[in-house]
Structures are given as structure tokens and as C-alpha cells.
């Protein structure tokens, strides 16, 4: 019964989200809490960042939809939030924002025996990624890079 109601609720909330140019990434209903906690993770359909105001604006129509559906027959707390920041760096904005931060570079191993390199993000160009590894700048061609993620450096 719980799963069926959750699925129905998810369908209703996705319709509401579409009206606000939002997409629901996940809905988590924590019935082990008192009151029950309904957590909804949203993102914008155009890819822009979610603001606190976006979450607040979506709260009222989401709450209204939950109330009108009568699918939750208990008191609950509604939490609307964004996915947060991804650890993976993909956009030029990411590379500018996190310059100097520790990164983990996953390599494709075509030309290297190493799977990963760790260092501080130094520079990104169209052709290569440069990281600072213990004071030495290492340029890695992008055709050798699978993934670049934020990490914590260990000595």
C-alpha cells in the first residue's frame, strides 16, 4: 500500500513540478520519523542552479498537492531541496570556480598504466588539463581523461 501511494504521489508531484519548469529527481518518504518527513529533490529543466527561493516557491504547490491527494494520512514535514553540487567537474564554470582545489583525474589507460592522478586543479584548455602534483605542473591531454572530480588530498 505504501509503495502504491508513493508512486501515485510522485506522479502528481511531477505534474506540479512541470508547471514550474522543474524536474523531480527523487522523493523520499521517511515514515520512521515522527512526524513523517517527505523529502523532494528538484532541479530546473533548463539546467540552471536551484536557489533557496526556488525551493520555497515550490513548497506551497507541492504541499497543496499532497494535501489534496489524501495519500498521506498523517502529519508530515515537507523538505524541498536541490541535488547540491556534484563532485564531478564538467563545465568551464566548474573549472574556473574550483581552480586550486584538489582533484582526482581518472585516466583511460590507453597510454598510461596509472588509473588516477591526484593534484590541485591548475588549468583547463581546449586540449589538456593541467594539475599541480607536489609543485610540478602535469599537463594531461583530454583524450586520456575519463573523469575529473573534486576530492581531498592525502599526503
Swiss-Prot record:
Keyword Transferase belongs to the record: no
Pfam hit, one: RimP_N
Cell compartment(s), UniProt: Cytoplasm
Q: Which UniProt keywords apply?
A: Cytoplasm, Ribosome biogenesis
Q: Which InterPro entries match?
A: Ribosome_maturation_RimP, RimP_C_sf, RimP_N, RimP_N_sf
> A cellular component term (GO) from this record?
cytosol
BP GO annotations: ribosomal small subunit assembly; translation
| Highest taxon in the source lineage | Bacteria
Tagged with keyword Cytoplasm: yes
By sequence similarity, the record places it as follows: Belongs to the RimP family.
Instruction: State the function annotated in the UniProt record.
Output: Required for maturation of 30S ribosomal subunits.
Question: Which PANTHER family is this protein grouped with?
Answer: RIBOSOME MATURATION FACTOR RIMP
Q: What is this protein called?
A: Ribosome maturation factor RimP
Origin species, per record, is Prochlorococcus marinus (strain MIT 9215)
